[in-house]
């Protein structure tokens, strides 16, 4: 592991957030991803590999502690995996919100509205807030924000 970052709503002071911690783990290039994935699954995490629509990332994986039989999460931690040479827009977005309280307030209000609208439908909730996230990530990139926290 090269680096670990806490990002997401719980990393932003005053932000409305579910009790979920998002952790970004940056892996060294030479790591064997199959071995890493096996270590995580042996520790009780579920591994989800997903394609990157932007084609800027590779080896995108998330790890979560499995849901219980009745569909309730046991723990609220998502571990996002990236290789060290991959862009990290989620860090730029979180940094921008920490530095711009007015944008953080607007995002918090949007999240609250969408949570009421979509309830436990995570996919629709994520899709509905994506325009906001993309807009402020672009602003962070244009403003020359640092790549890391």
Locations of the language-model features?
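Catalytic core of pol beta-like nucleotidyltransferases
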Residues: 1-6, 10-18, 27-37, 41-149
């Amino acid at each position: 592991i090269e680096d670990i970052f806490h990002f997401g709503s719980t990393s932003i002071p005053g932000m409305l957030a579910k009790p979920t911690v998002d952790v970004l783990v940056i892996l060294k290039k030479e790591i064997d991803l199959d071995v890493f994935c096996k270590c995580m699954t042996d520790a009780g995490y579920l591994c989800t590999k997903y394609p990157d629509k932007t084609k800027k990332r590779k080896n995108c994986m998330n790890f979560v502690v499995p849901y219980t039989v009745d569909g309730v999460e046991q723990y609220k931690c998502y571990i996002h995996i990236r290789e060290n040479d991959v862009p990290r827009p989620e860090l730029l977005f979180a940094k921008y919100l920490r530095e711009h309280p007015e944008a953080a307030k607007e995002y918090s209000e949007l999240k609250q509205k969408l949570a009421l609208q979509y309830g436990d439908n995570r996919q629709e909730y994520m899709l509905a807030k994506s325009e906001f996230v993309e807009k402020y990530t672009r602003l962070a990139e244009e403003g020359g924000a640092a790549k890391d926290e």
